[in-house]
Amino acid sequence: MPAIMTMLADHAARQLLDFSQKLDINLLDNVVNCLYHGEGAQQRMAQEVLTHLKEHPDAWTRVDTILEFSQNMNTKYYGLQILENVIKTRWKILPRNQCEGIKKYVVGLIIKTSSDPTCVEKEKVYIGKLNMILVQILKQEWPKHWPTFISDIVGASRTSESLCQNNMVILKLLSEEVFDFSSGQITQVKAKHLKDSMCNEFSQIFQLCQFVMENSQNAPLVHATLETLLRFLNWIPLGYIFETKLISTLIYKFLNVPMFRNVSLKCLTEIAGVSVSQYEEQFETLFTLTMMQLKQMLPLNTNIRLAYSNGKDDEQNFIQNLSLFLCTFLKEHGQLLEKRLNLREALMEALHYMLLVSEVEETEIFKICLEYWNHLAAELYRESPFSTSASPLLSGSQHFDIPPRRQLYLTVLSKVRLLMVSRMAKPEEVLVVENDQGEVVREFMKDTDSINLYKNMRETLVYLTHLDYVDTEIIMTKKLQNQVNGTEWSWKNLNTLCWAIGSISGAMHEEDEKRFLVTVIKDLLGLCEQKRGKDNKAIIASNIMYIVGQYPRFLRAHWKFLKTVVNKLFEFMHETHDGVQDMACDTFIKIAQKCRRHFVQVQVGEVMPFIDEILNNINTIICDLQPQQVHTFYEAVGYMIGAQTDQTVQEHLIEKYMLLPNQVWDSIIQQATKNVDILKDPETVKQLGSILKTNVRACKAVGHPFVIQLGRIYLDMLNVYKCLSENISAAIQANGEMVTKQPLIRSMRTVKRETLKLISGWVSRSNDPQMVAENFVPPLLDAVLIDYQRNVPAAREPEVLSTMAIIVNKLGGHITAEIPQIFDAVFECTLNMINKDFEEYPEHRTNFFLLLQAVNSHCFPAFLAIPPAQFKLVLDSIIWAFKHTMRNVADTGLQILFTLLQNVAQEEAAAQSFYQTYFCDILQHIFSVVTDTSHTAGLTMHASILAYMFNLVEEGKISTPLNPGNPVNNQMFIQDYVANLLKSAFPHLQDAQVKLFVTGLFSLNQDIPAFKEHLRDFLVQIKEFAGEDTSDLFLEERETALRQAQEEKHKLQMSVPGILNPHEIPEEMCD
């Protein structure tokens, strides 16, 4: 059967690709049917035949036959794909008469198909694709080769309503392509040219829209016109909006007609988003007229929440569009409305609508409303941050001396506070949740949407609390009373209330916070005693833990409370309900980090520091915890011990702290001394892994002083490492590499890995490089290097490489002498694991380049000391790195190369021979990634490296001839070298293009941003021919812009008390 299939496929392919005979349209239809309805081999054959045909340079000459005679819609779509391909990729090289022919054909086809209203409805998708083809042609042709396009399309529109409706769609698509999606698709110059052309000729388009809106009775046409207008509103000259009848037409004629109300409201929202000062009167009119219409369509006493839940799609969309309109208008022009006394009432009505819409049970709508409430609260706070009502204990009356704008919004903001408290989203720290079935369970998947919503709500509530925290406190206290007396008791109500209480940490005066929290915690502890049932207790426990974790300032100031809370957490550590123990450990570690000093001091009324009590009872506290919870617990206690400044006391604490794990460790080591086979026992190996994990977490928290514990187990630990390595190698030799997947072998590897993590973790926190280099490094190298080299690739631990990188980064010059030994053991054998492809051994890959980077940055002389053959391998591996598809590896590779070039330039003796051997090679490889689409994210780094290299040449830093065979001036040689390189890679480029590009590489190499733009425009030119998507060329800018926005936002947040979660605040600002 497959043989027959192949013959048929060959026959079909031969016949379809034979351009000397007429196209067999039935055969093509059959092949397309096979693709869509066939299976397996048949489908694959069809795919191959169609791909071959599509890639044929003359395929486009068959498109007219396909579109005219095929009865199969999918075949027609296939024909259009061929056409789109030729327009995007080969238009520039087609003879003019052929371009004109295609253009005429497409226009004729669109007119024919869209002039018939029944056809328009029936063949909607087909016409949509034809329209897109025309827009692709326009991007190539208009305005230069088709200056009359706008007047052509406007003129044709007046001949038939159904043609006009489709032309509106074409204009909408053109607007989107030019104004919304042009960045990176076309060169900057061309994009500007198209935008200018469109603005200059807009009056004809606008007259057409106006004509339709005023005269047409054809509802679908009017709708299409409004949709098109909507796309224009963000770029057209403002006179068309504010100096015509457009606004009143939209409001009076279309807003109250159900079919048009959504698109009209969207248009009004787009207009409301314009921020200019010279049209205040028009904005007032827009607002008052829209509000009048709104009150007729949706009276102020409507229960919008109910209306939304019972509404049809169209009605629900209207409420969402209404929220967007109000949010946009009030954000942009709210202050204008405040200033006009005659508009106060309308402003209050708009706010009333916002409150009603905010109650709708639909997260997307709530997010829109939240954006406005956040904006309003932040603006009112920033206007006068220090006029927050003074402490009510000090001021007899509640609202004295309130700024007038706050006074205006007083009652609205109180309702918004209630709304935020009742709807607060779940914070990240809360692990105990109610699922869809109404069961209380532990949450395993973090919901990022919900976390972001929480952050925005939290920020809004913090601002609202600053504006009037007496009101906030009254609302929260009242709701808490209703939980205790049972009138509002439910898991959901308790949760949202407690999440809201936790979210305003830092926003009250300390005295008020204390009074408020004492009430809250007492009430919640009482509720915990009062309620029966495990689920109830779990929910209340999770809320107590969340709140206490959010108020470290309060806990630091009130020792008795801190102690009560920590003892309560120890109680919860025995509570086996899903998620409660996890949350208890997480909250304990947070409190330990923020209040660490308080646990190592003797507090008033205590006989010893609390840390001693914890260590005395450690066994009882952790007896019901799972291993990973024990590790978290140990890290938490480690932070406390790290805060003890007396070295002798601290060493004594560490000994006591590590007593339990050390007892088990000593017993295993003793047994192993008598019989080494104990290290093949699964239970024993598992225990060793867990003990080492405890040490790793403890070391992370204690830091350098952990040396006393590390020294105690160090040599035994390295012996265990060697012994387990031999066991693993023996098992692989006996049973092959598959054995590495077995549980016992995996446990053994865990012990090796945790050993390396412990050592690297301590080294990175140590503060005496010489002591580390002399005492800890030699036995480590002895245990791990030869073992790594001898192991089969699958059994090599990537942590060996990361540990070496950490040691080099930390010890710098102290370790230079050991680099050759390290390199001998790990370099070549790892390179052979990763240079076959870009995928295998991802961790070794990343760590290998981190090690190279460390040596390059801190021990560069060691590079110059290794033999030339090995140095060539180093360079090859750097080139291999920056060609990687794994972005982190490619970035590291570029970083290493740039540092290497800068380091080499400092070494007079080595530099010239390096340039002679490698300079042109490096240049060639960098150009190969610059022009590769999968590497556009590295454009800034590519630009920096190339600019640096061209600068070296231009400034004569390279004295040795780069072309020994024909020693001309290096600058001229490199100009020719690069030009030839590019011409052979991209033969379609004109000589003038290449020359201009190469000249720019020299003239712009002092200005990195300009150099990068120069590269980017060149890439657009290459891609336009190749017909590739160019949107990714701006990937890096988008990332940078986002990062900068994030940093700006963080700075702003730091300045408002309570905006940052207490655990995001740097340590020195807290304790």
Swiss-Prot record:
Record-level GO cellular component terms: annulate lamellae; Cajal body; cytosol; kinetochore; nuclear membrane; nucleolus; nucleus; ribonucleoprotein complex
PROSITE patterns: IMPORTIN_B_NT
Region feature Necessary for interaction with RANBP3, mapped onto this chain: 411-481
Residue(s) carrying Phosphothreonine: 448
InterPro entries (UniProt xref): ARM-like, ARM-type_fold, CRM1_repeat, Exp1_repeat_2, Exportin-1/Importin-b-like, Importin-beta_N, XPO1/5, XPO1_C_dom
Modified residues (Phosphotyrosine): 454
Region (Necessary for interaction with Ran and nuclear export complex formation): 327-450
Superkingdom to which the source organism belongs: Eukaryota
Modified residues (Phosphoserine): 391, 450, 1031
GO biological process: cellular response to salt; cellular response to triglyceride; mRNA export from nucleus; negative regulation of transcription by RNA polymerase II; protein export from nucleus; protein localization to nucleus; regulation of centrosome duplication; regulation of proteasomal ubiquitin-dependent protein catabolic process
Alphabetical keyword list: Acetylation, Cytoplasm, mRNA transport, Nucleus, Phosphoprotein, Protein transport, Repeat, RNA-binding, Transport
Domain Importin N-terminal: from-to ranges: 46-112
Positions of HEAT repeats: 217-240, 241-277, 354-472, 515-553, 560-597, 602-639, 775-813, 885-916, 917-954, 1002-1039
Stored Gene3D superfamilies: Leucine-rich Repeat Variant
Entry's Gene Ontology molecular function annotations: DNA-binding transcription factor binding; nuclear export signal receptor activity; protein domain specific binding; RNA binding; small GTPase binding
Task of the protein: Mediates the nuclear export of cellular proteins (cargos) bearing a leucine-rich nuclear export signal (NES) and of RNAs. In the nucleus, in association with RANBP3, binds cooperatively to the NES on its target protein and to the GTPase Ran in its active GTP-bound form. Docking of this complex to the nuclear pore complex (NPC) is mediated through binding to nucleoporins. Upon transit of a nuclear export complex into the cytoplasm, disassembling of the complex and hydrolysis of Ran-GTP to Ran-GDP (induced by RANBP1 and RANGAP1, respectively) cause release of the cargo from the export receptor.
Protein family according to the UniProt entry: Belongs to the exportin family.
Subunit structure as annotated in this protein's UniProt entry: Found in a U snRNA export complex with PHAX/RNUXA, NCBP1/CBP80, NCBP2/CBP20, RAN, XPO1 and m7G-capped RNA. Component of a nuclear export receptor complex composed of KPNB1, RAN, SNUPN and XPO1. Found in a trimeric export complex with SNUPN, RAN and XPO1. Found in a nuclear export complex with RANBP3 and RAN. Found in a 60S ribosomal subunit export complex with NMD3, RAN, XPO1. Interacts with DDX3X, NMD3, NUP42, NUP88, NUP214, RANBP3 and TERT. Interacts with NEMF (via its N-terminus). Interacts with the monomeric form of BIRC5/survivin deacetylated at 'Lys-129'.
UniProt protein name: Exportin-1
Lineage: Eukaryota, Metazoa, Chordata, Craniata, Vertebrata
